[in-house]
């Protein structure tokens, strides 16, 4: 592995550019047209996410700052004469989301074009959000730290914005939804019944029709501009409207928090009749799959197939084990490694060797790779605690939950080449997958 070097970048913020100002963010945003402002900020945020290597934040930042009042842009110019802004981060994703969240807390539902004063106040509010963002960095890592020190310093702060910084790809979401609604029912009669009842309740011909309605509409949004966050849907597309309505936030009930929980739950906002704005595309991609499950749960409850109280929990639990950890994971591994590796699924291992096997087994030449697939969610209060020991303890506890008769995360670390051979009545009966006796390289992977 190549030697890597940690690089740090400075974020420009309100306190260094406007040391003599004392603006309050709620006063700055009180009269800014909320819908128009949210559309602008979410678009700039999308452009930041879609930046190419070599592009700089100037491309997003400059058109904005040039439309502000002199009392806003002149101090920036004076600061730029002293320091090279090319070394600064000018657009921060977390700070942009903070600004959207603040706009939602003082939402006024207005759609007028933004004036010079509006853009000025919006920029000042963003710079205040950059101060909030910087306050989250309690301890900065450096290149001289040992591995454990680096993790202890870096991970707590990194986790706070991990959902925002981690990459997402809508094409992967489409594949997962296709596997769920089209392929999985072919192998699972229980879920095939669920899909059939779902389609009947929605009065649609097939699951494929449903996917086409949702994802083709979504893809059309990006035909003209890949960073576009605004989508208009024809009122006759009832299923698409119903699906996106289920993911649309009601600003009158919004409460701000540093983890954006309500925005994650409802990542869209309506800025007009059948006009939807994706506040942050990554949040939508995280939520769309879960939103589809809520959609299905509601339909199945209406038809008496699922219990109204525990319907979603039961559906999620069933799909987590039968679809995510087995069918989808097995299919993914088989298609990625099936030609060049000896491979066996967890079910095949259990049939041959009994309970307590990993979820997947690969071998290439003299190397074994054993996989544990686990979908772990960490509570926001743990993730945002900033305490390394608290986070570490919760992570180890989550990875040691008991699935199918073994302690996951504990047992997987103890696998070695001798684990995979047959025993009959306690006696050696031949190595699983015909391993040679000298093979001793085994790598557990979560």
Q: What is each PLM-predicted segment?
A:
Residues 333-363:
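A short acidic/basic microdomain associated with nuclease active sites
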Residues 267, 275, 437-446:
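Polybasic (Lys/Arg-rich)
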Residues 359, 366-370, 433-435, 444:
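Beta-sheet entry/capping signal
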Residues 351-356, 377-380, 441-445:
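Flexible loop/turn segments at secondary-structure boundaries
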């Amino acid at each position: 592995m190549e030697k890597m070097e940690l690089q740090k970048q400075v974020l420009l913020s309100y306190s260094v550019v406007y040391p003599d100002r004392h603006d309050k963010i709620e006063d700055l945003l009180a009269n800014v047209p909320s819908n128009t402002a949210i559309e602008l900020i979410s678009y700039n945020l999308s452009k930041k996410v879609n930046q190419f290597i070599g592009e700089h934040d100037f491309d997003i930042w400059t058109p904005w700052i040039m439309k502000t009042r002199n009392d806003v842009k002149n101090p920036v110019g004076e600061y730029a004469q002293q320091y090279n802004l090319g070394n600064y981060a000018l657009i921060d994703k977390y700070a942009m989301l903070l600004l959207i969240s603040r706009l939602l807390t003082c939402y006024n539902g207005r759609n007028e074009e933004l004036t010079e004063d509006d853009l000025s106040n919006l920029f000042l509010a963003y710079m205040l959000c950059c101060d909030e963002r910087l306050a989250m960095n309690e301890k900065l890592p450096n290149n001289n730290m040992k591995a454990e020190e680096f993790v202890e310093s870096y991970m707590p702060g990194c986790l706070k914005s991990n959902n925002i910084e981690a990459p997402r790809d809508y094409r992967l979401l489409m594949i997962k939804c296709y596997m769920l609604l089209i392929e999985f029912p072919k192998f699972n009669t229980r879920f095939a019944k669920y899909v059939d009842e779902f389609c009947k309740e929605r009065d649609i011909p097939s699951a494929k029709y449903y996917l086409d309605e949702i994802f083709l509409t979504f893809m059309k949004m990006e035909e003209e501009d890949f960073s576009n966050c605004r989508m208009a849907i024809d009122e006759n597309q009832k299923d698409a409207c119903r699906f996106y309505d289920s993911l649309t936030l009601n600003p009158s009930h919004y409460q701000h928090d540093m983890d954006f929980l309500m925005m994650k739950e409802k990542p869209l906002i309506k800025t007009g009749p059948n006009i939807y704005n994706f506040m942050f595309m990554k949040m939508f991609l995280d939520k769309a799959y879960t939103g589809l499950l809520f959609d299905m749960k509601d339909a199945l409850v209406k038809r008496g197939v699922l219990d109204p109280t525990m319907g979603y929990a039961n559906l999620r639990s069933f799909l987590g084990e039968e679809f995510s950890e087995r069918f989808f994971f097995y299919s993914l591994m088989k298609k990625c490694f099936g030609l060049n590796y000896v491979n066996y699924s967890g079910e095949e291992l259990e049939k041959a060797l009994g309970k307590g096997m990993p979820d997947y087994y690969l071998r290439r030449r003299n190397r074994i790779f054993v996989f544990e697939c686990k979908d772990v969610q960490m509570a926001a209060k743990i993730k945002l605690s900033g305490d390394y020991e608290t986070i570490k303890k919760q992570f180890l506890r989550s990875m040691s939950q008991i699935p199918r008769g073994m302690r996951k995360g504990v047992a997987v670390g103890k696998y070695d080449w001798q684990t995979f051979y047959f025993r009959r009545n306690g006696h050696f009966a031949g190595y699983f997958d015909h391993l040679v006796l000298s093979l001793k390289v085994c790598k557990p992977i979560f």
